[in-house]
Amino acid sequence: MEELGSRNPSIGLESIGFSDLSVVRYNFEAAQLYEEALAHGEAELTAHGALCARTGQHTGRSPKDKYVVRDANTADQIWWDNNSAISPENFDRLRQDMLAHAKGMSLYVQDLVGGADPENALPTRVVTEFAWHSLFIRNLLIRPEREALSSFQPMLTIIDLPSFKASPERHGCRSETVIACDLTNGLVLIGGTSYAGEMKKSVFTVLNYLLPRKSVMPMHCSANVGPAGDTAIFFGLSGTGKTTLSADPNRTLIGDDEHGWGEKGVFNFEGGCYAKAIRLSEAAEPEIFATTQRFGTVMENVVLDERRMPDFEDGSLTENTRCAYPLHFIPNASKTGTAPQPRTIIMLTADAFGVLPPIAKLTPEQAMYHFLSGYTAKVAGTEKGVTEPEATFSTCFGAPFMPRHPSEYGNLLKELIARNGVTCWLVNTGWTGGAYGTGSRMPIKVTRALLSAALDGSLNSASFRSDANFGFAVPVSVPGVESRILDPRSTWADGAAYDAQARRLVDMFIANFAKFESHVDGSVRDAAPGARIAAE
């Protein structure tokens, strides 16, 4: 076995059971990984120097194929209603079979860190079959200084072998695709999928398990900080605008997806960004667009023309096209990945029903209610001929990555909001003037203007009305924003149709929250939406 690159000489792959490998390349950097990926036909070079790979059958995560080992340590700690269990015996069989499958292979290893706060960091070794996967995860996690590699000690190891096919009969899984996590022993096994996002979300899942025990709140959010040290957190599901809205030229970006919040403030889990690229434009998102023109960026499932120019309008492979780049590619990104205690929390939703206002102020109890609800609405794929929006409730704005019961995260959030006097806002980046198919997407300029007023504190002094359906406070007027758009009912041609749609959405919220009723106190239950008379 030939071993190349910088590493801790006392910890090779044989320490986790690998044997008879061909070549192992440790901690290769971008240029080296480009050479490897291109030489093996894994990816294409774009006209501007980015690397573009296709993931084949899997163009997104496979949440139904994700498992957690159920053992003596995890049996009472995991929210099993939301996490599928795998036995220690089946996991060990899977591990042995993956190690056997790897014999004769050349593999890539990256020694990285999850968590910019040294006290809460998770040193992570990622072993991949593909060079482009190695570059992807190198972009996404925190890269230690080169001299630190010689003493690197991983607490988590991820083995990612897309060519390995799991066996439901032999491994106790659902399909040939598997993402299995042994939280007790710090090992994640990924097989049967080339979608690179599985690696980053596996690190997130492990941190989401470990950190609450240390009274640190793990969050599926983006974060930025203003010149006055005013940190803002942006919660939101995929497609709601976390990455876009936190990339603000007037504020320092902490990170776009995963953070922790503890006694010292906020810290990024990552050292890079994983931005959606579908319909990406230089006009709307100049900073993210610029990263696609750079050497080192990895693009996933973006269609290239014959000149190797990316066509961001083309969703023929998937709507979930992505680009992964180091955080320092964003001009005003934080160099430390840390920020003071947050002053503002923004909960983003893309309401395709056209019911929610573009912004609303939340009480701490309403904030916990909406955090546990985790609402957005997806628009069905046009290929199915379905135009009705579909409500999606993903608790904590990231249910697939939350191993513990949502109430653990919700109570921690409520405590941190109260302790730090944080102002909370719900922001709708979805539809206005009607539901999807009738109305139009909320203009990003409107959203940015409202966010600016919320973040600089000027929105706190606005006049508010109480929303008739949800009970939260909605500003009546905001400088630079047309007042009509602040009241969603007035943007609909038919007010009665709006009322009916709003009632349906309220009922969806109430039905979804039933499972949390027994886990929250009365003040949070009272924050539920319901028919109210608007206080004009």
Swiss-Prot record:
Q: Which residues bind substrate?
A: R61, Y195, K201, R322
Q: What is its EC number?
A: 4.1.1.49
Q: Report any one BP term from Gene Ontology.
A: gluconeogenesis
Q: Give one Pfam hit by family name.
A: PEPCK_ATP
Q: Which reaction does it catalyse?
A: oxaloacetate + ATP = phosphoenolpyruvate + ADP + CO2
A GO term for molecular function = phosphoenolpyruvate carboxykinase (ATP) activity
- Enumerate the NCBIfam families for this protein: pckA (TIGR00224), PRK09344.1-2 (NF006820), PRK09344.1-3 (NF006821), PRK09344.1-4 (NF006822)
Which protein is depicted?
Answer: Phosphoenolpyruvate carboxykinase (ATP)
Gene symbol here is pckA
